């Protein structure tokens, strides 16, 4: 009888720890998806670089707007870039040594999407 009681307590404990963590993760993912849909393929300014997001089979990917020389476009040109839908972009899934601070800006773009309150 005591074994059954301990097993029951174990499942209650696990249920009270795991379920709130899963629901919090789902809430954050939903908020990030709502932020992603609100952007509507427009670019946002992160670290004086223009970023946008794509929803792919592996999740949301950040991408930075670049000119024809693979130099990130500054935030001062956001209206031009949002009006011109044929802008070149680089995805953040690969590290770029030729662009200083590329990885840091990408991490910040992801954190701005997922952790805004």
Curated annotation (Swiss-Prot):
It is a single-pass type III membrane protein. Residues 22-117 are virion surface. Contains two intramolecular disulfide bonds. They are created by the viral disulfide bond formation pathway, a poxvirus-specific pathway that operates on the cytoplasmic side of the MV membranes. The lineage of its organism: Viruses, Varidnaviria, Bamfordvirae, Nucleocytoviricota, Pokkesviricetes. One of its GO terms (biological process) is membrane fusion involved in viral entry into host cell. Part of a stable entry-fusion complex (EFC) which is at least composed of proteins OPG143, OPG147, OPG155, OPG086, OPG094, OPG107, OPG104, and OPG099. Formation of the viral membrane is necessary for the assembly of the complex. The chain crosses the membrane at residues 1-21. It comes from the Viruses. Belongs to the orthopoxvirus OPG147 family. It comes from Vaccinia virus (strain Western Reserve). Keywords: Disulfide bond, Fusion of virus membrane with host membrane, Membrane, Phosphoprotein, Signal-anchor, Transmembrane, Transmembrane helix, Viral envelope protein, Viral penetration into host cytoplasm, Virion, Virus entry into host cell. GO terms for cellular component: membrane; viral envelope; virion membrane. Pfam families: Pox_A21 (PF05323). Envelope protein part of the entry-fusion complex responsible for the virus membrane fusion with host cell membrane during virus entry. Also plays a role in cell-cell fusion (syncytium formation). InterPro entries: Poxvirus_A21. This is Virion membrane protein OPG147. It is found in: Virion membrane.
